[in-house]
Amino acid sequence: MQCPPILLVWTLWIMAVDCSRPKVFLPIQPEQEPLQSKTPAGCTFGGKFYSLEDSWHPDLGEPFGVMHCVLCYCEPQRSRRGKPSGKVSCKNIKHDCPSPSCANPILLPLHCCKTCPKAPPPPIKKSDFVFDGFEYFQEKDDDLYNDRSYLSSDDVAVEESRSEYVALLTAPSHVWPPVTSGVAKARFNLQRSNLLFSITYKWIDRLSRIRFSDLDGSVLFEHPVHRMGSPRDDTICGIWRSLNRSTLRLLRMGHILVSLVTTTLSEPEISGKIVKHKALFSESFSALLTPEDSDETGGGGLAMLTLSDVDDNLHFILMLRGLSGEEGDQIPILVQISHQNHVIRELYANISAQEQDFAEVLPDLSSREMLWLAQGQLEISVQTEGRRPQSMSGIITVRKSCDTLQSVLSGGDALNPTKTGAVGSASITLHENGTLEYQIQIAGTMSTVTAVTLETKPRRKTKRNILHDMSKDYHDGRVWGYWIDANARDLHMLLQSELFLNVATKDFQEGELRGQITPLLYSGLWARYEKLPVPLAGQFVSPPIRTGSAGHAWVSLDEHCHLHYQIVVTGLGKAEDAALNAHLHGFAELGEVGESSPGHKRLLKGFYGSEAQGSVKDLDLELLGHLSRGTAFIQVSTKLNPRGEIRGQIHIPNSCESGGVSLTPEEPEYEYEIYEEGRQRDPDDLRKDPRACSFEGQLRAHGSRWAPDYDRKCSVCSCQKRTVICDPIVCPPLNCSQPVHLPDQCCPVCEEKKEMREVKKPERARTSEGCFFDGDRSWKAAGTRWHPFVPPFGLIKCAICTCKGSTGEVHCEKVTCPKLSCTNPIRANPSDCCKQCPVEERSPMELADSMQSDGAGSCRFGRHWYPNHERWHPTVPPFGEMKCVTCTCAEGITQCRRQECTGTTCGTGSKRDRCCTKCKDANQDEDEKVKSDETRTPWSF
């Protein structure tokens, strides 16, 4: 998966201020578009749902694969009654490819059109379809002499950065009496199709879940709230993954509500609309305003504050709810900034009763006010005037977030770049009182460390601006300490990624290592909040590599022995080749330190960008043992250093007995619902969760799956919203005449499979021949065939899945039911997938098919029967005959394979036949060429 770094830029729009008289402020709100339809409409193709105007390359499954030269489109349609629907139309785009300008174009993997070597692939024409895809941005090449890794707002256009959203959550005003006076601020960051959120709340407790719904109340998504789910007590962190296009459209138009639901009520207690806001990008301080009178409920406010770039002017935007005026549309308010109940700033203004949002600026803060602002000693309050005044207030603190402040220090980012193979790894914690806690690991330097400093970007190469000297806190390669006297300007620069860490050594007085402090977006990996990352350096590679690159990684094992990792790097890809200069081209690997078996490495991920993250669910015993003993490493390899450019040693004590988790009679797989990256559901939360199930004297989490006590071998149960559903395990049909029963399994297997499993059983953990099926989160042995169990639907008898042991992939196929000509088809058993005709009404066509299939080993493919050992090219509508795929009937089993092509060395003297490129025959008959051209179809690939 490609992960190019994206810089998001907002500009804060502030109106002029005149404190001498009240002003009417324009409401700050996004442009809203009318919602055209509530009911989602779309297209179904290949078992997948696509929203209207979606486009995709069809995937026909093995062995056909993805048709990159075919583009399908979900075309919006309307019925006679005006109901929206979708229609799939597919087009061959091969003829739309532009003519390459070079003499020897090549066809890149996963592309349809040929391109010239070292040239970017051509864009697909958009004349026929309208696409509304996501924006993917690339790093701008920054060759500043002083801070090569510095990213600023100049790197990204304003329109490209509109992916941050906010919501103010208050009690509904139409409910009487109001149930709560709680208030919450929800901040969202849209990363491709994942919505990351952090919610800070006050005056509300016993939260159970976060609910997302449309304006009509239809629930789109719910996220459970866990006691261990966030790094702060008053903050909830989470991810809404894989939003579809229709949901993204609702989000961009401001038609999604976010709500907090408690354990005491089934309906949301506080809610608010998610909207875009210009203040989010530059927000450094914030405040939640709650009613000062506990009897006042249903109101609240949110303040987002920032500082000017140069002057100490405090800009703020207020979002208010629940204020009411005595008459007219204008509400006069008084805004005050106080320190220890002493008012230091105030202003009057008029706001609209419909849109209670406005912006202001407080000019020329003094040095004392800047310090109070940083330390959370200022309070902002809003009061209305009249016979029934209302008031709300809140403490101004640094912006709270679920992100992690971190920095990778490398030689490539030093003021004068170095290549020593050293590394610096920093984790920063910003407390509510403005105290900055820092922990830095330094390793691999060529000489003694002389200074560790926190700096701003220098204006000139010879004049560095040091904010705080950490050298006194350096001991044995580690720096740990606090900075307690930072002012508001310092914290503002920290949160805007304008501060740097610099490490000077005896040989490099200006700095051997340097890194920019940046926020790492929330990912659900809990290890980021529990321990320091593992430094990755060239000096740790065997043999050591003198490189300007560096990195660090968080690595953890969950209770199911699944490995979760997140890697951040800097300095990679800065080769002389300009084409590689903008991106990291890396391969993350896991291996063992010992050189006795250098080939024993596990590829985690190949990636672009500055970070990589993921999980591995099938680690073998040997690597798990090395992790437990501390003799394992994680490294990043590049084209320049394929055997490793940076590396770090990792130690994760564990007692994993096998590389995967299987559902066996002795060991149920999932006892608790898993939150984000594999943490267990807290038992106390289970008792309070209204969706939990009680079964056989035990509490089970919503969505969990287990083997019941009454039949631990051939039954499986699941919990779905207080309802327990138990299904017998249905065994798929076998292609053998003498199946055998194994003592530890419910379903029989063929004799040859039994022997294979007995031979391979001791080596199973070593070879990792098996599959992890995400549908029911269970481990399957290689070659296993089963009906999938998919919560909350239960056992799916209309599909059969197969575990491909060589690749670890699970391939599921829909059971194709035969067409019936009878008038009253029936299911012989209620759990059967396909209906069948009663015995007395078998049609002549079925009898003919039965007679055709009487031949020994005959196969049925589509609507045709093929005798044993017959070979043919399959026909797949609408693509026609697949000449590059050959199917064979072998003893009643159809096997299809794609023709494999070998590389050619004949240079330009080559030609392409149906599937592969071959060298030209000098004596090729010209008539054969003409014939080949005439028989080519528009669906050839």
Curated annotation (Swiss-Prot):
<dbReference type="GO" id="GO:0005615">
    <property type="term" value="C:extracellular space"/>
</dbReference>
<dbReference type="GO" id="GO:0043009">
    <property type="term" value="P:chordate embryonic development"/>
</dbReference>
<protein>
    <recommendedName>
        <fullName>Chordin</fullName>
    </recommendedName>
</protein>
<dbReference type="GO" id="GO:0036122">
    <property type="term" value="F:BMP binding"/>
</dbReference>
<feature type="glycosylation site" description="N-linked (GlcNAc...) asparagine">
    <location>
        <position position="433"/>
    </location>
</feature>
<dbReference type="InterPro" id="IPR052278">
    <property type="entry name" value="Chordin-like_regulators"/>
</dbReference>
<feature type="domain" description="VWFC 2">
    <location>
        <begin position="691"/>
        <end position="751"/>
    </location>
</feature>
<dbReference type="GO" id="GO:0005576">
    <property type="term" value="C:extracellular region"/>
</dbReference>
<feature type="domain" description="VWFC 4">
    <location>
        <begin position="857"/>
        <end position="919"/>
    </location>
</feature>
<dbReference type="GO" id="GO:0048793">
    <property type="term" value="P:pronephros development"/>
</dbReference>
<keyword id="KW-0677">Repeat</keyword>
<dbReference type="InterPro" id="IPR001007">
    <property type="entry name" value="VWF_dom"/>
</dbReference>
<dbReference type="GO" id="GO:0009953">
    <property type="term" value="P:dorsal/ventral pattern formation"/>
</dbReference>
<dbReference type="GO" id="GO:0036342">
    <property type="term" value="P:post-anal tail morphogenesis"/>
</dbReference>
<dbReference type="GO" id="GO:0009798">
    <property type="term" value="P:axis specification"/>
</dbReference>
<feature type="glycosylation site" description="N-linked (GlcNAc...) asparagine">
    <location>
        <position position="350"/>
    </location>
</feature>
<comment type="function">
    <text>Potent dorsalizing factor. Has potent axis-forming activities including the ability to recruit neighboring cells into secondary axes. Regulates cell-cell interactions in the organizing centers of head, trunk and tail development.</text>
</comment>
<comment type="similarity">
    <text>Belongs to the chordin family.</text>
</comment>
<keyword id="KW-0964">Secreted</keyword>
<feature type="domain" description="CHRD 4">
    <location>
        <begin position="528"/>
        <end position="655"/>
    </location>
</feature>
<dbReference type="GO" id="GO:0008201">
    <property type="term" value="F:heparin binding"/>
</dbReference>
<feature type="domain" description="CHRD 2">
    <location>
        <begin position="281"/>
        <end position="401"/>
    </location>
</feature>
<dbReference type="GO" id="GO:0030514">
    <property type="term" value="P:negative regulation of BMP signaling pathway"/>
</dbReference>
<feature type="region of interest" description="Disordered">
    <location>
        <begin position="922"/>
        <end position="941"/>
    </location>
</feature>
<dbReference type="InterPro" id="IPR016353">
    <property type="entry name" value="Chordin"/>
</dbReference>
<dbReference type="Pfam" id="PF07452">
    <property type="entry name" value="CHRD"/>
</dbReference>
<keyword id="KW-0217">Developmental protein</keyword>
<comment type="subunit">
    <text>Interacts with twsg1 and/or bmp4. Interacts with olfml3/ont1.</text>
</comment>
<feature type="domain" description="VWFC 1">
    <location>
        <begin position="41"/>
        <end position="117"/>
    </location>
</feature>
<feature type="domain" description="VWFC 3">
    <location>
        <begin position="769"/>
        <end position="838"/>
    </location>
</feature>
<feature type="glycosylation site" description="N-linked (GlcNAc...) asparagine">
    <location>
        <position position="244"/>
    </location>
</feature>
<feature type="domain" description="CHRD 3">
    <location>
        <begin position="402"/>
        <end position="522"/>
    </location>
</feature>
<feature type="signal peptide">
    <location>
        <begin position="1"/>
        <end position="19"/>
    </location>
</feature>
<keyword id="KW-0325">Glycoprotein</keyword>
<feature type="domain" description="CHRD 1">
    <location>
        <begin position="161"/>
        <end position="279"/>
    </location>
</feature>
<dbReference type="GO" id="GO:0045545">
    <property type="term" value="F:syndecan binding"/>
</dbReference>
<feature type="glycosylation site" description="N-linked (GlcNAc...) asparagine">
    <location>
        <position position="735"/>
    </location>
</feature>
<keyword id="KW-0732">Signal</keyword>
<dbReference type="Pfam" id="PF00093">
    <property type="entry name" value="VWC"/>
</dbReference>
<dbReference type="InterPro" id="IPR010895">
    <property type="entry name" value="CHRD"/>
</dbReference>
